[in-house]
Amino acid sequence: MDKDNQALDELPMLTGSKHANKRLFAAFMIFGLLNNVLYVIILSAALDLVSADTPKGVVALFNIFPALITKVVWPLLSNGKIRYTRRVGFCTICSWFGIITIALSSSLSPRLLGISLASLSSGMGELTFLQLTTTLPTEATSKTALGAWSSGTGFAGVAGAGIWWLLRGLGVKGGLGLSSFLPLFFPITYKYILPPFSHLEASSDSSPYQRLPMSSSLSNNNNFRPPAILISVPSSEYVPQHTPLLSSGFIDRDRDRNRDGEELTDGDKRLMGMRASRLTTQEKMKLLRPLVVRYMLPLCAVYVEEYVINSGVAPTLVFPLPTYGLWSWLFKSPRDYYPFWSLTYQTFVFLSRSSLSLGLPPIPKRLLPLPAIIQFLVLSLLFLQAKTFFFSSPAYTPPADGDGGVDRSITIVFLLICLEGLCGGSGYVNTFYHVGREGSVSENYDADGDNEMGGDRRTVNVTEMEKKAMEREFRIGAVGAADSTGILFASLISMPLEIALCRSQVDQGRTMCREL
């Protein structure tokens, strides 16, 4: 009879968990889309935001530098528990105020202030939601969330360019004013779409998990609800990551409520009070050192290379207009080349960032430098084309402009930019996938259930578990600075590189880059 009652009690949770993973995927995809779409809209609107005599690189600089500072400094300075609800609220207000400031201003200074605020929100948002993926109940749900986040950020590139293309006719005030409603979906998604983590936990009950028995001193406390610590035989798919009750996911970092909005019991609060876990500066630096070579340098290199291509080389990849075939339908003016290269790049970034969501296996950790190596080859080949017209047939090699037909180098450049997008997206999603797996609970237990310190797994060191969760949050937050660092370096390289490549083309008799 007791078993029947227990089954009836668990039925609502099992029913509620039916669509929990779908809600999780949708929530993190929306988070990724919202976090990056304003960044793309602002870059797409750069020509309209500054005067003709102001370098457009100023917009790019103010659009990336505050985000970089946030992602570099915040993980090192912040300590203790992360209050995700407050962070989401901060990102919403900061992003909305920034875009409204841009829309309602007509001079350069307040617009740059608004761009900086939007950038600050974007940096804090990426830091927050990447850290949130490490707090989910199982490795499978973390993988789902990370894949959805990556897909959303990838789609933001296509969506942002498309939104501004549709709204540009309304001008800066009208177009950006309409875009200002987008940040309001952050709290809506966080509160109403993101599922309670207990539902995600319930959806994993059919997997070979066992709840970790608590010590008698805790389990005998009538006011104490045992944390749902999940332990299983090590597997490649489902690996428990943390204690959901104590982690920053299940307890929403508010003192009196959990992620489900339920009041915490006195036992929960006492257990939270037991936590003295804080990462010292020395501990953070110890965690950071192995991340630099293993993850941050390869990711930074990928971003330097791809943004040098996008901002420094791609604007000079201009060809005589084709007179037949598909390319003649796409390119009606020399000004059509650069937007097409950008769209191609963004599309393939979206596809590669969605690889985890599409069920493709991640690349092995030892191969994480591979996207950067391939990206360097792509950069080198495109540089040669822009500098020496390496792939052009003799009829299209300057000073000749062809006598009708299609320059074969258009197709080659298109394929190389497709590869560029695949490498960039792959470097991002695979790096954060492997960073998120570091320090999981399963690494601290052997197959017999004994932990690294020789203790029985039936005795739970709550403080140590919570500290492990903080370490995972710090790792993924710290690595997040690598991409913004790469973009900043690329912007410093790209401006003089574009000028030098265009001057070289003009010297050879091809002046199209000056006529755009």
Curated annotation (Swiss-Prot):
The chain crosses the membrane at residues 24-44, 57-77, 88-108, 112-132, 146-166, 169-189, 371-391, 409-429. It is a multi-pass membrane protein. It is found in: Vacuole membrane. One of its GO terms (biological process) is regulation of intracellular pH. The keyword Membrane applies. GO terms for cellular component: cell division site; cell tip; fungal-type vacuole membrane; vacuole. Coiled coil: none annotated. Keywords: Amino-acid transport, Membrane, Transmembrane, Transmembrane helix, Transport, Vacuole. Belongs to the battenin family. Involved in vacuolar transport and vacuole pH homeostasis. Also required for cytokinesis. This is Protein BTN1. It comes from Cryptococcus neoformans var. neoformans serotype D (strain JEC21 / ATCC MYA-565). The gene is BTN1.
